[in-house]
């Protein structure tokens, strides 16, 4: 297995809306794995919105579904919900959709503000080469929606050493992993798995634990009992 650790500087922050959000759009404190993989795929599929996946169509990010991804904050941030003018016509009854009064609405949208702050993303895989992984990492331009610009400051690539047992981590992990010791900095969230890349299909919900404080937003170290973890440049990422 190989890994890449990507050090990103966020221009203002990021916004990734929670699954099934509609009139209200709360956001995540950290971008989920599917978002991170989507950001990675941009370097190879820039300008391609969908691809043929046999008898269905979907996001090009589906080709990288075998890559494991996680993230942590390197800087402190703040979560807020801004008032945004959004299209809401597709939530209206059919007879209302042509009425200009019901085209737009004022929607509270979750955002993490962290101007010039740093986000660290780790990818672990054995499905692509080191050279391709590093190239794709340097090609990341945003995290989340298209306005969430990011600059890659550095990319570290190396061999991911598989370990198990008790390790300490600041990266998020699935809630099936047992946390030992202090548990006051844990936030439980529901992400989607990779079927969310397929048009017309809903990704199955997957529960994760974020070791983070909510105000200010800051990643914290926790100790866990891991079945599958990897040492990546002096840190540990946990996947089961």
UniProtKB/Swiss-Prot annotation:
Molecular functions per Gene Ontology: RNA binding
Keyword RNA-binding: yes
InterPro entries (alphabetical): CRISPR-assoc_prot_Cas5_N, CRISPR-assoc_prot_Cas5a-typ, CRISPR_Cas5_sf
CDD domains registered for this protein in UniProt: Cas5_I-A
One biological process term in Gene Ontology: defense response to virus
Cystines in this chain: none
Keywords recorded for this protein, A-Z: Antiviral defense, RNA-binding
Something else known: Cloning was done with strain P2, while interaction experiments were done with genes cloned from strain P2 but over-expressed in P1. The aCascade complex was purified from strain P1.
Family per record: Belongs to the CRISPR-associated protein Cas5 family. Subtype I-A/Apern subfamily.
Subunit: Part of the aCascade ribonucleoprotein complex, minimally composed of Csa2 and Cas5a, which binds crRNA. Other possible components of aCascade in strain P1 are Cas6b (SSO1437) and Csa5 (SSO1443), while SSO1399, Cas5b (SSO1400) and SSO1401 have sometimes been seen weakly associated. Csa2 is probably the major RNA-binding subunit. The Csa2-Cas5a-crRNA complex also binds target DNA homologous to crRNA, probably forming an R-loop. Purified aCascade forms a filament about 6 nm in width.
Reported function: CRISPR (clustered regularly interspaced short palindromic repeat) is an adaptive immune system that provides protection against mobile genetic elements (viruses, transposable elements and conjugative plasmids). CRISPR clusters contain spacers, sequences complementary to antecedent mobile elements, and target invading nucleic acids. CRISPR clusters are transcribed and processed into CRISPR RNA (crRNA).
Protein name: CRISPR system aCascade subunit Cas5 1
Lineage: Archaea, Thermoproteota, Thermoprotei, Sulfolobales, Sulfolobaceae
């Amino acid at each position: 297995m190989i890994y890449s650790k990507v050090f990103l500087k966020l221009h203002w922050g990021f916004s990734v809306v929670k699954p099934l959000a509609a009139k209200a759009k709360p956001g995540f404190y950290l971008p989920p794995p599917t978002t991170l993989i989507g950001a990675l795929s941009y370097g190879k599929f820039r300008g391609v919105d969908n691809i043929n996946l046999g008898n269905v169509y979907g996001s090009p990010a589906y080709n990288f579904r075998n890559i494991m991804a996680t993230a942590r904050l390197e800087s402190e941030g703040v979560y807020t919900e801004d008032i945004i003018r959004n299209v809401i016509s597709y939530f209206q009854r059919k007879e209302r959709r042509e009425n200009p009064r019901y085209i737009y609405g004022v929607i509270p949208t979750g955002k993490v503000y962290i101007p010039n702050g740093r986000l660290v993303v780790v990818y672990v895989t054995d499905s692509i080469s080191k050279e391709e992984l590093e190239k794709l990492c340097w090609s990341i331009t945003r995290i989340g929606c298209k306005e969430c610009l990011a600059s890659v400051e550095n990319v570290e690539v190396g061999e991911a050493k598989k370990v198990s047992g008790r390790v300490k981590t600041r990266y998020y992990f699935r809630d099936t992993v047992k946390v030992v010791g202090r548990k006051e900095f844990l936030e439980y969230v529901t992400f989607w798995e990779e079927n969310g890349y397929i048009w017309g299909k809903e990704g199955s919900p997957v529960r994760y634990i974020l070791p983070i404080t909510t105000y200010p937003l800051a990643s914290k170290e926790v100790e866990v009992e891991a079945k599958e973890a990897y040492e990546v440049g002096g840190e540990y990422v946990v996947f089961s």
